[in-house]
From Swiss-Prot:
Designated name of the protein: Flavohemoprotein
Domain of life per record: Eukaryota
Organism in which the protein naturally occurs: Candida albicans (strain SC5314 / ATCC MYA-2876)
Reactions catalysed, as given in the entry: 2 nitric oxide + NADPH + 2 O2 = 2 nitrate + NADP(+) + H(+); 2 nitric oxide + NADH + 2 O2 = 2 nitrate + NAD(+) + H(+)
Molecular function (Gene Ontology), one example: oxygen binding
Gene Ontology CC terms: cytoplasm
Gene that this polypeptide is encoded by: YHB1
GO biological-process terms attached to the record: cellular response to nitrosative stress; filamentous growth; filamentous growth of a population of unicellular organisms; nitric oxide catabolic process; response to toxic substance
Amino acid sequence: MTVEYETKQLTPAQIKIILDTVPILEEAGETLTQKFYQRMIGNYDEVKPFFNTTDQKLLRQPKILAFALLNYAKNIEDLTPLTDFVKQIVVKHIGLQVLPEHYPIVGTCLIQTMVELLPPEIANKDFLEAWTIAYGNLAKLLIDLEAAEYAKQPWRWFKDFKVTRIVQECKDVKSVYFTPVDKDLLPLPKPERGQYLCFRWKLPGEEFEISREYSVSEFPKENEYRISVRHVPGGKISGYIHNNLKVGDILKVAPPAGNFVYDPATDKELIFVAGGIGITPLLSMIERALEEGKNVKLLYSNRSAETRAFGNLFKEYKSKFGDKFQAIEYFSEDNNTDDKIVIDKAFNRKLTTDDLDFIAPEHDVYLVGPREFMKDIKEHLGKKNVPVKLEYFGPYDP
């Protein structure tokens, strides 16, 4: 489905129609977006790989779209307040490799869902025309912004990479190394520290490809990318990686993406807070910060010593960089804090917000972990006016 969008000026009457939709979206926006996704995913196979079934079941994707539609309607006369949010959408779309031909599918399903759910006296001809123009303007904005970002990328769409090594990092984490099949991609394009790669997986027995994003867990050496994956019970992709993936297999990989990246310009002390496998995008940042002579403090929370990845790497950092590097660890289900694993300090309990009381606006804070973990920490530090850089995988929380 190919449509060339052009920006069209909404009339005052059409602007009023969009603004009058705000109460409807406030009351029933999530119902509308749930129906929208059911319609789109049920009827258009080409968009199915973009969507994580867990995010759909937990209603993350419908919630974020409802939030986006509501705020687009509220700000239809001036989108300036949505600048940062639009940038987030663009970053996510680039990572997933959303293309211009996907936008008409979204627009068609959105209008059809409005017709289905809203009474005809509301979803009349004028209403549908106003929202068709409004959506077209938004699509044009996003397509143009994404085209500018795609032009910067070292390749387009998903390229074949061959698995070169698989390393067991701890009980339930494996690192996978892979290099491009197409030698024209060498030397390997370097990501910014903290970025991720999107993969398309075609698993045995699955009708459609599945997309997953994994952080680049080591700054590339020897023309290899590395990701490190925790085995999640019941997880289709993590289970496949841990139980079936082998050296020589081919992976479909999109270019590095994401705006959660290391800022080398800072002269502040750096605080890295990681929950479990959230450590992966932080590894190359920590490495670079220490190489630059900066003070780095890591707060690292895991269930147990058995499920704590990269402990030996952090011991190497301690040996090499001394007091420039401090690692404080938390094991929520383990009583093993003997000298063999402790780097600076270790506690047999969960990391809590009380452990962050020393953090002040004079620190630069990077945070990655489970959603609730990040939400609690961000809220706590926000009360102290401490800015936090963080990464959500999947839909952003509003």
